Amino acid sequence: MESQQLSNYPNISHGSACASVTSKEVHTNQDPLDVSASKIQEYDKASTKANSQQTTTPASSAVPENLHHASPQPASVPPPQNGPYPQQCMMTQNQANPSGWSFYGHPSMIPYTPYQMSPMYFPPGPQSQFPQYPSSVGTPLSTPSPESGNTFTDSSSADSDMTSTKKYVRPPPMLTSPNDFPNWVKTYIKFLQNSNLGGIIPTVNGKPVRQITDDELTFLYNTFQIFAPSQFLPTWVKDILSVDYTDIMKILSKSIEKMQSDTQEANDIVTLANLQYNGSTPADAFETKVTNIIDRLNNNGIHINNKVACQLIMRGLSGEYKFLRYTRHRHLNMTVAELFLDIHAIYEEQQGSRNSKPNYRRNPSDEKNDSRSYTNTTKPKVIARNPQKTNNSKSKTARAHNVSTSNNSPSTDNDSISKSTTEPIQLNNKHDLHLRPETY
C-alpha cells in the first residue's frame, strides 16, 4: 500500500518520510509553500484512496516487515522499572479498562487490558452497565474513605454478572509501608475470597484446593503489583520475587504460615502465663512442656529470659512446691534448670514417701474376732442392787430383833451375839456377795 503511494508520487522518497522521525535536515531548493492547486487536489485524492484501501484491508493480514520503514506514529516510552517487577509486564494507570474488572467488581483504575483475561472473566454487554467504584478505592490503609465518594451506580443488569458472594467486591487498600504488609495481605486474601478465587489460596498444608489457571495467575500478578508497590514490600517478599517475579502463590503461602506462627506465639504466651503444677503429673513432663514453649518463643524472635521464665513458673506452683517462691525469689541469677532441680527433688521425695507406706490391709474377719475378744476396762461395772435390798432389809430386821432381845437375855446370849457379829453375813443371792456388818 505504501509502495503504491510512493509510485504515484515519485517526487516523495523514503528520505522525506524518515525526516519526520529523524533529526536530519533535508535540503531542497523548492519552497515548501510554493505548491500549485492542482498538486493539492492530487494529494487529497491520493490520501482518500489510501484511507479507503486501509479500511478494506483485514486486520489479520500480515504486512511484510520493512527494515527501512519508520512509523509515522511517535515512539512510546516504556514505563520505568518498578523494583522486582519486570519492565515488559508493567502497566500504567492510563491502561486501565473497567471491563476487565467487571466480574470481580473492581474499579476502573485497575491497569490491565482486556486481552489478558479469558472469556470466562469477560462479561457480556456494554461496559457502561457495570458499576464504578468511588475514588477512595485503592487508598492507603490509614486513609479514611471520603464522604463524597460513597455513591454507587445501580444497575439491574449487573446483578447477574457480579459474584455470587457479594454484589460489590472492595479491592484491597494500597500498601504504604513494609510493616503494614501482614495486615495488607489479610485484606488481599479476603479480596480474593470475595472474588470467587478462594480455591486458589493455599490452605494450612500449603496447597490450594484447585490448580490455578493462567488467566487467574495473570489476574493475581496484576492486582498484586498494583496494590503492593515494590518499594513497600518486605525483604523476604522481594527475595521471592527476585527468583520468580510471578510467584505470588508462594508469597501467599509464606504469609499464611507467618499468620499461623503468630497465632501459635500468642497461644504459647498465654500457656506460659497460666502454668499450674502441684505434683499430679511427673516433673519430667512438666519440664518438657515448659522448655518447649520457651524454645519455640525464642526461635520466633520473642526472647524469654531466665528471670521472667522462673517468675512465671513459680507463680503457678501450689501444694508442697509453693514454698519455692520464697526460697528462690531473692536469687537474681537463678536459671530455669536450677528451678526444675528443686521441683524434681520435691517430686522424688513425694514419690518416696508414698512408696514407704505399708500397703497391707487387714482381713475383715480378723477385725470381727478382735472385737469379740475385746474387754473394755475403762467402762465401770454395773451391779443390780434390787436383790440386795431385800436381803439387807431382812438382815436389818434380824439385827433389830437381836438387839431388842439382848437386853432381856443373859450374858451368854450377849456373847453369842457379839461373836456372831464378828463373822461375815452370808447373802444368798446370785452375785454371792460377802458383806461385813461394819458396812451397814
Swiss-Prot record:
Retrotransposons are mobile genetic entities that are able to replicate via an RNA intermediate and a reverse transcription step. In contrast to retroviruses, retrotransposons are non-infectious, lack an envelope and remain intracellular. Ty1 retrotransposons belong to the copia elements (pseudoviridae). Residues 299-401 are annotated as: RNA-binding. Residues 1-23, 48-60, 127-152, 419-428 have a biased composition (Polar residues). Capsid protein (CA) is the structural component of the virus-like particle (VLP), forming the shell that encapsulates the retrotransposons dimeric RNA genome. The particles are assembled from trimer-clustered units and there are holes in the capsid shells that allow for the diffusion of macromolecules. CA also has nucleocapsid-like chaperone activity, promoting primer tRNA(i)-Met annealing to the multipartite primer-binding site (PBS), dimerization of Ty1 RNA and initiation of reverse transcription. Residues 429-440 have a biased composition (Basic and acidic residues). Homotrimer. Residues 1-88, 126-173, 352-440 are annotated as: Disordered. This is Transposon Ty1-ML1 Gag polyprotein. The C-terminal RNA-binding region of CA is sufficient for all its nucleocapsid-like chaperone activities. It comes from Saccharomyces cerevisiae (strain ATCC 204508 / S288c) (Baker's yeast). GO terms for biological process: viral translational frameshifting. It is found in: Cytoplasm. Residues 153-165, 402-418 have a biased composition (Low complexity). InterPro entries: TYA. Its main location: cytoplasm. GO terms for molecular function: RNA binding.
